[in-house]
Amino acid sequence: MIPEPLAEFDTDEWSKKDFTERVRIGTNLYVLKGLGYPLAAYLFHAVKLSLFVLGWVFFCRFTPGLGTLRDFRSWIFDGTAFQKAFLWASLVEVMGFGCMSGPLGLRMWPPFTAFLHFLRPGTTKLPLVRGLPLLGTNTRTMLDVALYAALVVSLLRALVQPAIAASHLVPIVALLPLCALGDGTIALAGRFEHHFAMIVCFLLAGNWIAACKWVQLAIWFWAGVSKLTVAFGYVVPIMTANNPLLKSAALRRRLFVSYPDDLRPSRLAKTMAHAGTFLEFAAPLTLLFVTHHGPLLYVGMSFVLLLHGFILSNLPIAAVFEWNILSIYAAFFLFAAHPTVSLFAVGSVPLTVYLVVVLLVVPLIGNLVPSKVSFLLAMRYYAGNWAWNAWLFRRGSQRKLARLKRAAPLLREQLERFLSAEQAAQMDAGFLAFRALHLQGRVLGLLLPRATDGNPFREYTYVDGEAVAASALGWNFGEGHLADERLIAAVQEQCDFEEGELRVICVEAQPILGSTLHWRIVDANRGVLEEGHAQLSDLARRKPWDCGEA
């Protein structure tokens, strides 16, 4: 169970505290205890990860000679086993059983929401082209539901085949983009930049192993590029401090410059961040030149294991365990088991054009102009440099969200089903601290008084945009563009907030060649009230709990 809350979280006492007090208490507690998830939460994800692996083994058994646990070494690097791993992962993710599910994915009950949301007519969605005939509405139609159901069935159909043929892949490759036209959230949930790209390689490549190597190398390389901003230095101590396996209070404090007064990343934390960036570049740039078994392969694989092993060992929120395990398996299959397959054996001009676009052009634009591309499509994983939003509801107006068709309410309401009001407040403080500790999150204190007419937490309730997207869209994964003006408009269409009842602070990511963050203050009824840019150097000088101009 979550430990009994501190006296500060007494319901009456907590309601009287302002932004500075809440963040100060929350950040101090976060550094020493993290978010404070109970052991049961981690056991839930351990079981889920085991079922992910066993599910893959189960579908491999449909292929003669595969899927036997006793002699798994004889088939684990079979081509069909690899294809089924990515088809299975695609099914798991597009149904919401993978990342951002369960307690570490900010879902208490129900722990899985995506498929419940995507299969229900009338739920909120974000069409890629608003107003597009048949698919461009803000609420889900029977056509949207039918397309999504067909995608799920197509993935299942491919998984139960003895061998994967083009006829099994064509429906998947056609249906996911069609689903995305109606709701771009589904494309992100299906990991369009990774799992879908691999499936396209299975379908179009003369040698799909060569093509898949390019996809996996790009995943690591662009992840490394995304770390070349000041924001990543803040990610490592925040992620590490939330590790329940890290028991040493002294080591937790050493992650920050001077706990509890200066919570910028320490020299130790920055060194860890630089090491992580090195690994994300070193892994692909080493494996790029592997042509046979030998020292270069062993060094490259060591970099992969260190990189993903560090992420997994921190038991991070967002529940990205399946994706990290899949990436490790992909490294072993593509490079250790098939080192002699040349990267230049793709053998398909259309696929080469596709790979250039999705592995080079899109990530490049996403790093240069992050407002135009999802951080997932730009492969900017774990960078801490993401768009995000703060939704501010006046005088309980969040109750209007009940007008939406949803698979789950807001996170706070879910917490209160299992915890006391004081315990729920303590968890809330942890989530607020998590946001405020990030460099981008320090915009919150800067803009909060302006967005709330000087009355933060007295008249307004703060809800992170992640929690709103999770409830309103059924899926979220750190993608701030899912909770910006498009979702505000879709929610306003159904909930009809009066002027001042819902204000949203929207913050964009830092362009890799820039030094500012673009922000907007939006009223759901009136539109954009104010916008501007915040200098990263100014944000770095702010304390997480500073409120207003510091």
Task: Identify the residue ranges that each predicted region occupies.
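Alpha-helical membrane-anchoring segments
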Residues: 1-550
